[in-house]
């Protein structure tokens, strides 16, 4: 997201179509980097489910067409972890010391700690951000987690870890490959994200961008993309064509009671970002079991 944003901002007119996530769409709308969409030219928009429209980052759905969505959750090896995995608390359980993998991501790892502490993943309250920091510092003492990038997709299959944070698409794909691996969205909720197709405000080929968005939003296209990538589709017609074990998987298409506890990231004000940055610096400086921690 951040690399895409910088390229669009510093090279106006170079890119016609971009695929930002929710919070980045909010930021780009505020900075007039996105063009309003003429839905008369995108008839396949009718197939996008109502649950994915008019969300906080684009409340009138003028700028974005949902493309793919997912969650952050937990993947674990059920042949080695036999207790029910229903809560984020398990990532703080000392009996899994040296087995836990966490994201090398300020926002994602602090989000899990905020959820565990009972707060919003978009908290702007200093005491709540401090509480999340303290949760991760305590986790460091209890389980000495490994921080890295996408290690969850390799460490669990290789038997190097028993339980990891992971994005839903990767988690569900690994579950398909190994029946002992289980992906779950904890009962407390998680980050629910949406990647969308957007047209830049300086696009030179708006017609081509509209045609591509309409093509991707077609039922058959959306179905092929979802099957290939493994993430859940916002296309209600495509979902109906997915195998029953996919469309009825509660950890892919979550039940309402879990979905209601999930949150989309918002673009944080600069002063709040600084609070998150400072918390992350303290977490990084305390953690020796890491692979180049990053923002």
Residues covered by each model-derived region:
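Early extracytoplasmic/lumenal segment of secretory-pathway proteins
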Residues: 1-27
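Ligand-binding "clamshell"
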Residues: 29-36, 58-62, 173-185, 247-250
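Conserved C-terminal helix/tail region of periplasmic/extracytoplasmic solute-binding proteins
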Residues: 256-295
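A bilobed periplasmic-binding-protein/Venus flytrap-type ligand-binding module shared by bacterial periplasmic
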Residues: 73-80, 114-118, 193-208, 216, ...
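Mature extracytoplasmic/periplasmic domains
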Residues: 200-261
């Amino acid at each position: 997201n951040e690399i895409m944003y910088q390229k669009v901002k510093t090279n106006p007119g170079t890119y016609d179509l971009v695929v930002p996530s929710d919070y980045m769409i909010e930021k780009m709308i505020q900075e007039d980097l996105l063009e309003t969409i003429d839905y008369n030219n995108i008839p396949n928009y009718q197939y996008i489910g109502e649950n994915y429209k008019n969300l906080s980052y684009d409340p009138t759905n003028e700028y974005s067409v949902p493309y793919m969505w997912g969650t952050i959750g937990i993947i674990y090896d059920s042949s080695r972890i036999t207790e029910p995995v229903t809560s984020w608390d398990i990532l703080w359980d000392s009996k899994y010391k040296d087995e836990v993998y966490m994201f090398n991501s300020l926002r994602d790892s602090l989000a899990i700690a905020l959820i565990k502490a009972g707060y919003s993943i978009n908290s702007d309250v200093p005491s709540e951000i401090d509480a999340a920091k303290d949760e991760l510092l305590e986790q460091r003492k209890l389980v000495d987690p490994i921080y890295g990038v996408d290690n969850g997709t390799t460490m669990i299959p290789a038997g190097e870890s028993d339980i990891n944070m992971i994005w839903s698409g990767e988690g569900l794909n690994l579950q398909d490959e190994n029946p002992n691996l289980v992906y779950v969205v904890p009962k407390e909720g998680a980050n629910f994200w949406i990647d969308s197709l957007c047209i830049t405000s300086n696009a030179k080929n708006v017609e081509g961008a509209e045609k591509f968005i309409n093509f991707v939003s077609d039922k058959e296209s959306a179905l092929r993309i979802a099957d290939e990538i493994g993430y859940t589709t916002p296309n209600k017609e495509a979902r109906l064509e997915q195998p029953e074990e996919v469309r009825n998987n509660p950890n892919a298409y979550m039940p309402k009671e879990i979905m209601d506890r999930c949150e989309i990231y918002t673009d944080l004000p600069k002063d709040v970002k600084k609070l998150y940055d400072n918390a992350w610096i303290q977490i990084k400086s305390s953690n020796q079991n890491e692979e180049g921690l990053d923002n």
